[in-house]
Every structure is written in C-alpha cells, then in structure tokens.
Amino acid sequence: MATIPVLPVSDTLKEVKGGCILRTLDRRHFYAVQTPQVFPREVILTAYRQAKRFGTVGTDDAALVEAAGFPVQIIEGERSNIKITYPDDLLYASVFLKSIQHTK
C-alpha cells in the first residue's frame, strides 16, 4: 500500500481570499507530509500515466496517487527529517546538523 510519513501541523492555518481571512481551519485535521514516500511500483506508474493523460498536477507523488484513486496510508514522520525547498532551509539544516554533532 502507498505510505507516506506525516507530522501534525503545529501552525495555525487560515484560509485566505483576496488578502482577507475567510476562516481558521482546524489543524487537528491537517498534517505536513514528508519524504521518502513509498508506493508499489504499479501504483506509482499508473498514477503518473493518469496524471499525464488527464493533466493532473500534484505537489508530491502522493497527490497523484490519490488523484488516481489509490488509498494512501500515513505513518508518523520525524521532526529531524528537514525538508529543503528554499535557500533558507539550507541554513536551518546546517545549524541543525551542527547542533546534533555537538551533542554526540
């Protein structure tokens, strides 16, 4: 089965439109998704084929698997599994790595 690691969201989440807050979302129902994500070979291949065929766009592989109709289960992620997306993330990761090296 498709499986992804997640962490409960700790930030307050707001739905915004036109620069104004529409509502505050209940963060108990939201999770931050991590990698690595694990999929049976045929599931991920089918998901990508369908995404190409229908023009489906996803921000991660799991979104494409969901869109293709496959179930995706979650497991508890790890806070130290830092996602590197923006240049500032590299600085944060560097500081984190130095801090754990000093504790060993």
Question: Which ranges hold each PLM region?
Answer:
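Anionic-ligand binding region
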Residues: M1-A32, V38
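Conserved alpha/beta core of the MobA/IspD/sugar-nucleotide pyrophosphorylase nucleotidyltransferase superfamily
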Residues: Y31-K104
